Amino acid sequence: MRLYRDTAVVLRLHKLGEADHIVTLLTRQFGLVRAVAKGVRRTTSKFGARLEPFAHIDVQLLPGKNLDIITQVQTVDAFATDIVDDYSRYTTACAVLETAERLAGEERAPAPQLQRLTVGALRAIAEQARPVEFVLDAFLLRAMGYAGWAPALEECARCSAPGPHRAFHVAAGGAVCTYCRPAGAATPSPGVLDLMEALLRGEWEGTDSAPATLRTQASGLVAAHLQWHLERQLRTLPLIERSRPHAAVEVDLSVRQDGTRDSTTRTANSA
């Protein structure tokens, strides 16, 4: 069996035996890969801290029957150094990793765009170039675009009527016009959907001056839209202060007796 190399982001670790780790990687060419790092928990390990979550690495692997084996590791970016010492950056980066793993799908399904988005988000968090809530929301919106779940923000999600539209409904797919608006649709404050569109497109100019109320509502809608499609909540989002349920935006996901999901998006202005 031939060795192979790839660049990867370390998503998470699991202990294996007394000295090993199972490492979950998001690689550029092969998507999700689970591999064993032998002896990594020993103080004499040749891998050192290079196989910690948030690390961007160049890795050499030996294919195995169930799990590959990591044979060499070189650090490309040591993002963890600037992430783990700050709670906000740490929890935000954890949400990025969890989302990336959930969206990557099956093991060994190539996901180069998702890997690039993940590396870019971790770099922005580590460098503190922008508010972490904007980095996370921009990542989530773009990652949903990669998965085919990007919310409609400029035209009606149901009839494609050009906007701007005021209402937003998660199950409908995003912004909805007056005629298509379902019961329970949210009516976010003016500027919220524009802020989400700017984050999706990477148009950062002016985002820093967005009022806190708009940021909160945008974050709530982004998280709700993602979790509707994932069908269950991300474990890491409740750890992030701005992602907790707010009076401004709250989404109730429930399952009807016929097994279909019901979504009601509420805001302070819900009708």
Curated annotation (Swiss-Prot):
It comes from Rhodococcus erythropolis (strain PR4 / NBRC 100887). The keyword DNA damage applies. One of its GO terms (cellular component) is bacterial nucleoid. GO terms for biological process: DNA recombination; double-strand break repair. Involved in DNA repair and RecF pathway recombination. InterPro entries: ARFGAP/RecO, DNA_rep/recomb_RecO_N, NA-bd_OB-fold, RecO, RecO_C. Keywords: DNA damage, DNA recombination, DNA repair. This is DNA repair protein RecO. It comes from the Bacteria. The keyword DNA repair applies. The gene is recO. Belongs to the RecO family.
